[in-house]
Amino acid sequence: MFALSVSSEAGITRRLEKLTNNPEKCRGCGRRFSTGMTSTGEMARQLNDTCAGSVDMELFLHYSLIPSLCIILVLSFLQRRERCRQRDDTSYLLGDHFGIIVPLDFVGAFSNRWSYGIAFGATANKVMFLFLEGYQPLQVPQWAQAFVLLVGGFEVGLSHFPFFACLSSEFRLVSSILGFSYSLIWFVVTVLHITQCPHGRFLGRFETVMFYWPSLLCLSFLLGRFLHMAVKSLRVHLGWALQMKEKPFLEIHQAEHVKQLLRKPPLQEEQKSWFQTRVYEWDPCFQFPSRMIGTVVLAFICLYLFIVIEFCMFVYVREKLDVFEGKLESYIASVNQTGPLAPVILQVKELMNISKGVWLVTILPAALTCVSYLFHILACYRKHMKRLWAGNKHFLPVKFHSPSSSGSVVAIARYSGWQIAYILWGYFIIHVVQSLLGMVITYGLVLPVIHDQGLEMLHGLGIGILTVSIVLGLMIVQVQIASSFFLQPRMAAADKQKPLALNNRRAFHNFNYFLFFYNVLLGLGACLSRLLISCILGTWLIARIDRTIMQRGYERADMGFGAWVGMLYVDHCHTNPVLVSFCHILIAGHRERTLRPVIKYGHLNQSAGVTSRTANLEGCSCQDPGQSH
């Protein structure tokens, strides 16, 4: 699900070089740019022209499988199998060793949430290039690309498996040492790769640093985390500290939630602040699972990397447009600005300049929109889970009230990866829509003022606003006439509206007849507005996987929303605080009933042993050896 990939900068370089037929310089090669770029672009490329790093991140990814498999084998050997097979099975020779290692509990894990999230964040730049299909370890036909990406995902997933396995292992001392060593290897290799070639061909100075600093930060956190685990485990091993408690079946926040349900609701609710009412209210009786924390952390870092990659593409395209613009200026100068194509060329130059400016300006609002979506998705997850805990399913479409069990299990495996992909594609689509909107505003409002056509623009804008106002006013007048003349009075003074009972029927029929022809024309505008609003809302909410953008009755066609609902049902069935508390009571009662006879019979056996030993001692002391027969 959380797949990984290879070197960020190298992947961008390879993909961008496919966009042009001109010979360009690769990292560590002797080819140069032959196109005439701006001085800034040439300086940026010259920074990395002679860089030939000794670290090949793709090759290191392949070789990292060796220590990864060794760590997995060690942890698997330490992991005990709960159920051993029969003697006629060959696995019996292994004893109870080599159990299955679980990297992360994707359903009910609430501890080490941020450690798992940071571990996923350390793989963000790798995830990005599987998302962009920048990593293909094998060259196969086009129809087999899906299998190649699957193999690549398994390979890079296996290379980062020790991060999660060492965090979740029960053998804290061994796993912390192995995890620290493996994280240190990745950290040193990444730092070596950055220091050898810190600059790049697209962003110039410190381009490689911009790609790798999130992974370095996450690896640094993991180093500190594994070191802290090793120190704590060593103190316990030496007897300097108490043994850590076993992971509880019932989490504290789940128990607090059940206690809150059993309490009487307060007579008067506490007054909430503006932040709690409008933004977010913290709930001590609810915790997000590790899967949600890891998804959000990875989505944040992937969104940042996606924006950086997009900016690299923008720099590349902008330099190509600058070259094209220079050729257009040369043509205009050659014809002394009197040629038949001169006005068209000036308009094309203006279009290119406006497009570059609008695209650059809309990066920030598009990014902020997607960031707000990530926070909103967390809030919706908590809200939807609480509704399901209360037995309320009315917020879901009717077709999703009873999803299939197999579909829900698959959904929880799909959700995290799909959420990240939806955020990235949503950012790009929102950015395109905002850029088009910016182009419309620029051509409709800004350029007329620049070209001394402000009065004509205001005249046309005023006529348009007046036309729309009249149309909306006539629609409001129709509603007011219907309320005043064609409905019977309220039955009670406390009624909010009049009853749906017709009055003045003859006038009502004439009203409908004469407005019939007008409403045909009005319906054309309403239809176009419906299409426009649907397109805007659909593109604006494309990144929101927590709500469907399909019409009622077609919700099943939204696969992302189906994954969201299936994930909610799995979490609802496995982490419902009331259900978990009930199971906790059953398990505790069973343990108590199991231990009680053992304690009772053990006490009786101990008493019987003491009595018999006492009797034997008394018999030996009272009996005279000489009187024995």
Give the predicted meaning of each segment.
Residues 2-523, 528-629:
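Solvent-exposed, extramembrane regions of membrane proteins
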